[in-house]
Amino acid sequence: MAPSSLLLSVGSLIASSLASATSLQIREQSQSYQLTESWQGESFINDWNFFDRGDPTNGYVTYVNQSVAESSGLVKVTQSGSFYMGVDYESKLNPDGPGRESVRIESKKYYTQGLYVVDIAHMPGSICGTWPAFWSVGANWPHDGEIDIIEGVNKHDANEIVLHTSGSCDVAGSHDMTGSLTSGECGDASGTIGCVVKGTQGSAGDPFNAQGGGVYAIEWTDSFLKIWFFPRNSIPASITAGKPDSSAFGTPMAHLQGTCDFAERFKEQKFILDTTFCGDWAGNVFGESGCPLSDASSPMRSCVDYVAQNPAAFKEAYWEINSIKIYQLGAAPAPATVASPNTASEVHSASELAPATQTEKPTVPTAAETTVVPPASQTSTVAEETPIAPLATAATVTAVNPAPPATQPTAEPATAVTVTDGGDSFRTIFLTSTTTICPEAQSSSSAAAHGGNKNAPVGAVPGQPSGADAVGNPNPSTTTEAVAETETSQPELTAGGISELPKSAPAPTASQPTSEFKPSDVPDVPKPSPEAEHPAPPAAAGSSIINTPSSSAIFGSSTAVGTFTSLARVSRPTGGATFVPTIATATGSPTVGEDGSSGSATASATLTAPTGILFTAGARKLSVGLSGLVGALAVAALA
């Protein structure tokens, strides 16, 4: 096997392996949970709202705002970086006055299905009169649902998981769980009890804190809700590594799944962390929990009296959260970016679109044509020069959205003009021509050029998808072709024909058609389109008219400036561009002028793309001198 074939085979094998590995990686990511949001330390204070209104559960509590909570030390970031949220445990209160100060915070955003990992170092202990909870609720209760992830009252030592929603939502399926399902109907059709799972001992209260806390993991999908509790010394390695794998978590403490449509009954939820006192649940079961009754006939009154008169009992009624992390299937979504009005791209989220970027069709200027007073035959040299100098003569360029101002005339000649709209650059390259006339009869080209219909519009064929535009002329015997050019390409250059020159440029109107051009359609090596080789009849499009006087004749020679227009996508002005020489030869003869003038001449043109900047004084003299010498020899031979 030849060395080149062996290298090709090895390269193909490597490319195939890389492609397979990439596909596998993408497939694994789409099937695994990826971190999308995380709260820890200061972010609980900055990214959550402080609730300071009356308690919806009718508790004996005063929720304070962020300023009071921070100044009184009810919330803070610990030295270890965890978030502390406690209650007032110093003040004795009037049972008939405002309740004990506490904190309730709520996430600023709503969240939907995913995997939620909550690392808790400490939660309120098993204290009479307390009702701590970490839960979520939809915007429209009960229709959007409520999930009580961690909840307990008074001397509780086990978590109680409760779900609430509207209508009927049965989760009484036969699924393995370590907790005990005591009610399988989550909907309000059966009252406000909801579906209840009583967790294992040590999953809340004092036993939870004694083992250094632990981790709760909640997996919420269209068809089920699972909740795991892992004591501090039993946290799965995948959670510790930041790549949780719920399939390896083992049996959950709660597995709620049945005929209930979770996608319909549980909508987007906000998270809430709070500690209240007494209220509808803790107050009404105060005596049943083994707490002291000051009034045997009123558990609620007994609860309020205890909370008001025993501040020190609530020193351990605080939350200490290491972190809350949200994971979702697939890659983390990217934020949507709206491009500025001058660009045609709009970046959307990766989760919304298969392609990361959607490109709209920009509106671009119509093809521009430049006509030059013709000599009978010409030799043209193309050169590009940057930075761009102003035009030597007046030029009007028609563009659409936004319209750039017309270029003002200056005394210095230019070799190129670039009009930029957003990320697309439209460049007009000027051709310096040196002409030698070898007449068979007296030519009247100048008369023909200025005769006839002076206001005839200059035609243009709409832009081609290939990136090259063809420009037509009313005279079928002459053509002008626009050449698409890029910095690294070798464009084919076709010598343009001679057309008559109007005295003034036609004024653009609102009805002028515009061509559509997609930057992605510009090929690396532009090729003339069929329309460029055989121009279509002229269309009423805007054009650029550049009046360019010929240079003085030397030995029967003259110079003129022609142009072609380049449609090339460039990211910034280019300098010192280098082109590979390309030579094209065209022949033609002047036509009979509309004013009756006639004449004939043979013409030959050689169009050369130089390898460097040729518009210098020396280059101009050299070009004219060689052409003049050839012209002199030709005249002598004819004579």
Curated annotation (Swiss-Prot):
Q: Which Gene3D superfamilies match?
A: 2.60.120.200
Q: Its domain of life?
A: Eukaryota
Q: Which residues form the propeptide?
A: 618-639
Looking at its record, which EC class is this enzyme? hydrolase
Q: Which residues form the active site?
A: E146, E151
Which cell locations does it reside in? Cell membrane
Q: How does it sit in the membrane?
A: Lipid-anchor; GPI-anchor
Task: Extract one GO BP annotation from the record.
Answer: cellulose catabolic process
GO molecular function (one): endo-1,3(4)-beta-glucanase activity
Keyword list (alphabetical) reads: Carbohydrate metabolism, Cell membrane, Cellulose degradation, Glycoprotein, Glycosidase, GPI-anchor, Hydrolase, Lipoprotein, Membrane, Polysaccharide degradation, Signal
Occurrences of domain GH16 (ranges): 26-290
Under InterPro entries, the record lists:
ConA-like_dom_sf, GH16, Glycosyl_Hydrlase_16
- Signal peptide (UniProt feature, chain positions): 1-21
Question: Which family would the database say this protein is a member of?
Answer: Belongs to the glycosyl hydrolase 16 family.
Q: Name the job this protein performs.
A: Mixed-linked glucanase involved in the degradation of complex natural cellulosic substrates.
| Name by which UniProt lists this protein | Probable endo-1,3(4)-beta-glucanase ACLA_073210
Source taxonomy: Eukaryota, Fungi, Dikarya, Ascomycota, Pezizomycotina
